[in-house]
Amino acid sequence: MTTALITGANKGLGFETARRLIEAGHAVYVGARDAHRGREAATRLGARFVQLDVTDEDSVKAAAEIVRADAGRLDVLVNNAGIAGARKLGRIGDVTAADMMTTYDTNVFGVVRVTHAFLPLLEAGDAPVVVNVSSGLGSVAATTDPSRVEFRVTALDYNSSKTALVMVTSQYAKAYPAIRFNAVDPGYTATDLNGHQGTQTVEEGAEIIVRMASIGADGPTGGFFDKAGPVAW
């Protein structure tokens, strides 16, 4: 049975991704910072819970040790945990270095913390896959094209963190050719991150995450994908 870990899986896209992977026969670890909500989600899903705060090195290491002791390997890692950031939309000059650090600590450094801690387990896995949840707002091509809706969204910390995440994904893919690393854009999905203002459901948004988490050993690596295919970034 394939073993998967999803960060930020107690709600939204992470929860739906966990549900779909369990439905497909995976053994899933629900990673969540809040122990009560994480356990509740895991119970609802029929998953296993592991407390995991991606901004805390000790928490990440402890989670990796739990999975190592329990499963001995990891086949699928979905780095889904993320924050919207300072929410100073359109007010670039108001964004501080502290705002940037807070957003990057979850959206970029958190992914690196988790990936670093779980790399030995991924290397022991069966055709291992890592899916990093980015955003269309992380596409330089989209955000600089006046004809695209992304062009109108100016969020210095969030957008740039999602751009950085795609590059992080690319670098890991080159360094670890036996592991398929890909970034995905789930689309503008109604979640807590955007106050449920998104134009599509979590079921629709999770589609590309689940698809890329399910690729075989001959699947793509180092790419950025949405439900329509490769994304220019």
PLM feature spans:
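Catalytic loop of short-chain dehydrogenase/reductase
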Residues: 83-84, 91-104, 123-174
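A glycine-rich helix->loop->beta "capping" turn
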Residues: 66-79, 85, 96
